Structures are given as C-alpha cells and as structure tokens.
C-alpha cells in the first residue's frame, strides 16, 4: 500500500473517531397546541470542544420568537469549559432545562442543567470533581481550573455549595443526587 493511501486511511479513521467524541447536539422548532412555537435543543452523549459551536449553529438556524425554549439533557458530561460556555449561551437565550425520566445528567452536564431559567429533573443527576489535565494533586487542581465554578453556579442561581461538594468527590466516582439534594442546590 502506498504511503499516501495509508495517510488518507489514517486521516479518515481519525476523523471518524473525533466526530464520535462530540456530544450529539440537535435543535428543532415545533408547534405545541396549548403553548405555541417552542424551540427544543437536545444535548446527549459526551460534551467536547466544538459542541458550543454546534449549539450556536442550531440556534441560529431557528430564528424568531418562541413561547418556550427547552434543552433536553441526557449526557455523561465531558469538557467542563465547553459545558460552561454552552450553559452561558443557553441562559442568554432563555432556555429552561429538563432531564427527562429516561435521561441522565452527570459530571459537566450539571452546568447545562444549572443554566436553565426553570430546571426540571425527572431522571438522574450525578456529580463528581472534574479531572485535572495536569494530574490530581492540589497544585495541579489550582493550575488546571481556568474557570470559576462557584461563580458560574452562583450566576445561574444554583447554590455555590454545589461547587465545593463536587470537589469532594473523586473524578472516577459518581454521586447520584437525591430529590432533597437537587432542591437544596436549586437544581429542580
């Protein structure tokens, strides 16, 4: 096989692998009999760099006034920075957030849930400390967090104590929040 053909094959494999790492971000407008026009964004799978752009593109594809905007969440989390960017966009554009009964919102997905003007959880929400790119030491945790999680959560109307509680849970572990905890954090 020629080296050019091998390079092309490797490039195609890398492109296929990279596309599957992105969250699935879908946006569509619908007409609801009792409410009127609604805009629905669905975010599922792993949140990765590039998902903000996919969400923005989907929102721009559906201009106009809507009676209600809802983001449906079913995500295993992923990039904290990307989730916070997406969350700010959802808040600025007036979305409510919903974790349906068949959905899960874990890890960085919590930042999308927090962004909703109105937050509804029918499924499961789980939290943990995000992994630090430079390792898991105290020094790398300070160096590896270029964002203010407590400040973000506070701006979204969520109890800032969620940030410190998330930090207490190792990245490889997960804590499923109870209905009481969701209420205490103002996530439901």
Residue ranges of model-derived segments:
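Substrate-binding clefts and substrate-entry loops adjacent to catalytic sites
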Residues: 68-69, 93, 128-143
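Bacterial N-terminal signal peptides that target proteins for export
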Residues: 1-9
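Charged, glycine-interspersed solvent-exposed loop segments at helix/strand-loop junctions
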Residues: 133-188
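Extracytoplasmic/secreted envelope proteins and their assembly/folding machinery
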Residues: 40, 44, 52-59, 83-87, ...
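STAS-typified acidic loop motif
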Residues: 22-54
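Glycine-rich beta-to-alpha active-site loop
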Residues: 82, 91-133
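Second-shell loop/turn segments in exported
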Residues: 40-47, 72-78, 96-102, 134-140, ...
